[in-house]
Every structure is written in C-alpha cells, then in structure tokens.
Amino acid sequence: LNGKSAAMMLALSLVNVTAAFAQDDNSSAKEEGNRNVMLNAASANGPREIQIGLPSADVNVLENGLPVTYATNPHSVNTIWRGDASLSHQGLLKIAETAITTGNIGYAVNSFTQKGQKGFNGTLNYKSNHFGLQEFSLNMNGDLGKDWYYSFNMYQDFDPGTFKIKSTPYQDRTQIYKALLTKKYNGNRGEFTAMYKYANSHNVYNYATQSAPFIYVGDGSVKEYGNFKLGTTSYLPIDNEMTYHDMRTGELKQTSLYDACLNKASEVTLMNNYRFDNGLNWKATLKYDHSRGAMVYQTPMSIVDLKSDANKGVYNYMYRDIDGAVKAYNGQYVQTRMSCLNAGKIDEALFTTELSKKFSTSTFRLGVNEWFYHIDYCSNTTMYDQSVPADGNYALRIWDANKRDSYFYDFNKNASEYYKGSENKLALYFTHDWDVTNKLNLYYGARLEWQKLKGENAAVKNAKGEFVGRFADYNLGATAADGTKIAPADLSYNWLNYDFSVAATYKLTDNFGFTGDFTYIVQHPKFEAFAPATLPNTDKISVPLGRAGIYYNNSWLSLTSLFSYISKTNNNSTLNLQHGSEIKAAPLTYDIQTWGWTTDAVAHPFKGFDFHFLFTYQKPTYKKYETSITFSDGYVGKINATGNIVAEIPQILIELDPSYMITKDIKLWTSFRYFSKTYANINEAYYFNGHWETFGGLNWQATKRLALGCTVVNFLNQTGAKGSIAGAELITKDEAKGIK
C-alpha cells in the first residue's frame, strides 16, 4: 500500500549573496524551459520525474557533463547531489540531447558546479519548515591571484520528514562537501579545475514513508483506516533492528535500518576547457568515484484478516510488550513485509571529452564517452509480520507462534539479489545544429556505443538446465532441495548500441511555424538487470520517440502543440505474485507504447504577470504482457495485461504556473499539477482517482544581498493514495467489481 503524503508544509529560505556568479555556457537549444523540475511534492530536495509515457524511472542528473551516478540502484542521485548553493547552473536537457550524449532515455537535469570568481563571493541558503527541517547550503569562492581560483561548498540536511518515526530522528540526514581549485592559463583561453567531493547520506525516507494502510472504497477513492492519518502517521514498526542472512557468506547477521541505508561517496573530478585560435572549443572531464551505495526497502506484501471465517484458529500471533512479556495479538489485521537491504561497493571512472565549433549558421560537436563501472552488490531479504494499528499508534512486530518463535523468516527467499563485476561503455557521438535558411532549422545527431559487461551473478541452473530460483536461507554455497550447489554463474556480454535524433523547425511566418523531432534509441540491459534468480531477456531494447506539431509566438504568448508517439520493447521486470500466504517471483519481458498530445504555453498578458500552462493527454498500453507462476498447492497464477493501460501512469497531466510581481522586489507564485486516474494493478481491477499537487509561495528580494522566501506545499490539503496495492497483482476486474 502506498500512501500519498498530504501534510501542509511551510518552508522558509534565506539567501545571502555578495557577488553575482558567472554561469556556464549552456545552449538553450539543448534544454527545456518552464518545467520546475526541483519543485517536487514527493521530496523536499530532489528532482521530480517528468512523465514521457513510460513507467516511472529515476531522473537522470548530470553534473559538469557527467552522470552524478552511473547506476541509481543502489546509489541514488539524492544521496550524492542536491540542487544547492554549490551549483552555478541547473537546467533540463531535452530528450534528444540526453539520448545522444548519455545513451539514456528521458529528460536529464543538467547542472554545473560553481567555480571560483574574481574577488570574494559567498552564498548561504537556509531552509526550515514547521516540522523541524534544518537545511544549510554554503558556497564561498574567490581568487588567489595569478589566475588561480578556489571554491568551497558545504551542504547539511537535517530533515525529520512530515511525521515522526521511532527508529531515527531524521528521515533524511545528508552532508555533502566540495572543494575546487581552478587555474586559468594561456591568456584565459584555457581553464583547468580539480574538484574533490565527499558525501554521506542516510536516505531513511526511502523505506519509512512509502506505504500506509487504507480502505479501498471501490470507486477510486480511499478511506482512512481507523485513526491512521495518511501522510502524517508512520506505518513503520518501532523496532530499528533487522536480522538478515548474508547472501555472500550464509552468516546470520544483525544491523539497524539506519546503518543499512548509509551511502558514502568520495570523488575526484578533473575538468579542462580550452578555446583554440581557430574557434575550436575543447572540453574534457574525468571523474573517479569510490563509494558505498545503499537502498533499503520495507515492502508491504499482503494483509491477513485474522477475524475472517477462513482464518479463525489458523494463526496465533504474539508480541512483546514494553517489559518484554509475551502477549497475544488481538488486532484484526496482520501486515506481512519484506525487508530488502540493497548495498554495493562501487568504483566508477567516467570520462567525457567534446570538440565543438560555431560556424556562421551552425554549431558542430563531436564527443567521446568512456565510462567504467565496477560493483560488488547484493540484496539481503527478510520476511516479517507487523500489526496494523487502527488507533493510529506505532506498529509492532509480531510473530505466528504456530509456525515460529521469532520475528524473522524466509531469509533471501523472495527477492534476494547478487551480482559482481564491471560494465564499460565506450561511445562516439556528434550533433549538428544548423540554420539551413532564415526559416528552417535542423538539429541532428547520432551515437554509437560499445557496451561490455563481465562478471558473475546468482542465476543458477540445475542439472536439467532449469533455473533453481531462490529458497529460504539462500546464499552462495548453499544447496538447493534438488542437490544443486549454489555457486556464482559467470557473465560476459558485448553489445553495440546506437541512437540517432533529428529535429526540424520551419517558420511559416514570423510568428507561426511547424516543429517536429524523432529520436531512436537502441539499448541492452544494464548490469543491474542480472540481479534476480533468472537471466533477463538480452535482446535489444528499442525506444522510438516521434513528435510533430505547431508553434506560435508573439509579444505576449509562446505556444507549442505536439502529437507524440513513444514505445519501448523488451522491458525486463519481476513480479512478486501472491496466492494465499505464499509469494513467488515471476520474471517477464514486455513492451509498451504510448500515443499522446501535449500543448505547452507561456503567456505574459500584462506587466508583472506570467502564466505557464501545460496539458498532456496520453494513452500508455502494455504489449506482449503475459506471465504465469505455479504455487506449491498447484494453483497457477496467470496475468495477461496486453492492451491494458500501464499501471501508475496517468492519462491526463495538467500544469498551471501563474506568478505575479507585486512590486519589483516581491513575487507571488503558485503551481498546480493534476494527475488523472491511475490503475493500481496490472489487470485494471483497482484504480485511484485523479489528484492535484499544489505549491505556492512569496519571494522577496529584501536587499541587494538578502532574499527571503516562504513556500506552502499542498495548500488544497488533498489526501489519498497513489501507486500500487500490495498483493493485488492477480486480482481481476470481475473479482474487484463487488468491492465497496
């Protein structure tokens, strides 16, 4: 069950600036505007995902032209990057630019670190809210003489979240430090920068805030369960300790959830820019990162109704009170959870270099990526049960005395993962932005990439050539029921990936014209796709994206309206299907396609007032989505979702962003985002009604050096649920008809 945070939030930010910062040269042709990517209802300090008609994915983030992290599992972006005072520029790369320069799908946040400038300069950002958030961001930079410059950055986040949890005082405790030394040389035509970054983050919010119990009414709405308040009540058990079975050694170990989600990174980055006499520009950036990445999940699996006729006398749940005495649990419901402790030791070396030159009517760019990634990763899983408190109190861990005498069971049985080795990508790409005539602009580019993957995983086969799958107490060195010894399986793949993109804009008149673009991306699975108990489909993944439409510009209005098509083949996924109290993993490969229409407008109807409007209608559907799994009692769970609307993706998206300058120093703004009905399971049996996300604020440039801001999140005070309903994957429309 996924609960939608619905609390009213008030934030205050303060900025002290002693000098204007220079901004990196970033062509507007590469970036989107008007998207407010850092205005995120799901996170106080991370970028939001922008829908492109495909299932949810992590936001791509670049810093100084390189990915902040090569793979977001287990090292998420938000643990090593923040949109803070250390950045001189933040933008949003277009889909085509992201595809050509990185080989990835979707938009990408494009950021650059603040380098030293002449004189002494500083920025201090402070943000707080009525829940107790304390966030500090400091940049100090200046020159040392003889063309040497320095820049120091510190970020500190103490975020208790929107509700209290017992396991830790903070849902986000992050600290990031950066130090840069820059030397300009050869008459300022060249610039060399060395940067060191250290990050330490506990991303508790990833497991502490992602689920809640509620009553599904049947009409797309939900009711709160008892006194459990959605968005303000913690559904996490009081206990912070977790027992797990080490996937690598088989040892039984214990850790705290807070310690398990520790992320650390130590990075060295070297950057060189040089402008030749003939107008040629050369950029080169090299980054080495040694880190520990971690993602902890406490995934709700199923809810058991102890008071139902079928379950009376079947279970005997117990708990320990504050004195340690064992007592019977008399609640109506039991929540089963799967704890996933994902962690990996990471070494990555990323190098990108580009040559570019501006001509009278065009700009040409040639680039090379050499990206190396090494990881030793595993996910240790543990099952446990907890109470479902109707009184709004904290949940307790409980156990079924008829089956066991401790909280934890089925170690590594359901979704445990292991892989170790390296992935290397060597790519050559080019782009050409060309004003063919004063009416026609062409942008085109291509990327050719060699992907090499070598290592080992735990997709083990038996003597019959069948995958063994996971079982209780699974680890490397264990023996399966059929006698198969669990030993690492070697992996070795070499693939050729390629992308190309072309965009055209034709001015029919000074104000009106036609625009269109087409991007085609060919990928193969990343290393993380080899984590489960079976091998993924290693066929090529194709993503064509085409858009075509019109634009209109005048002195007060800028409007674009486009029809679009996007599809993706060979999506690898694993479903945890539930039948009774049994949970089994079902791997599958499927396709997706989405048709859509988007209209985007920015208006300035009168002095001081700006208005941004975005409307999208899209129809994302599954293709070739079929799988089945046989449970221990012989029941065969089948899913055929071909033709269904993709779960968790809305068909209508609306963004409204009005703002008004009350005076030349005071700005009043709001932002409204509407997400229409989304399906909560693959069979379209359950759905959630549409909802609004709302933001509003007042910004005041009090003096030349002081800016104040006040922001309110969710001022419409909407509550409800979004995402999926745990354990509902096999429920059909007919079975859900009678729910009220």
Write out the residue ranges for each language-model feature.
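Extracytoplasmic beta-strand/coil segments of soluble accessory domains associated
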Residues: 22-67, 94
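Predominantly transmembrane beta-strands of Gram-negative outer membrane beta-barrel pores used
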Residues: 60, 93, 108-114, 121-130, ...
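A beta-strand signature from Gram-negative outer-membrane beta-barrel systems
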Residues: 69-75, 80-123
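Repeated loop/turn-to-beta-strand initiation elements of outer-membrane beta-barrel proteins
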Residues: 121, 147-150, 187-192, 279-282, ...
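Acidic/polar loop-and-plug regions of large Gram-negative outer-membrane beta-barrel proteins
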Residues: 169, 182, 191-269, 294-340, ...
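Conserved C-terminal beta-signal and adjacent last beta-strands/turns
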Residues: 255, 539-548, 601-606, 610-612, ...
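Structural signature of Gram-negative outer-membrane beta-barrels, strongest in the C-terminal barrel
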Residues: 346, 358, 363-373, 378-382, ...
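Gram-negative outer-membrane beta-barrel transporters
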Residues: 438, 556-558, 562-577, 585-682
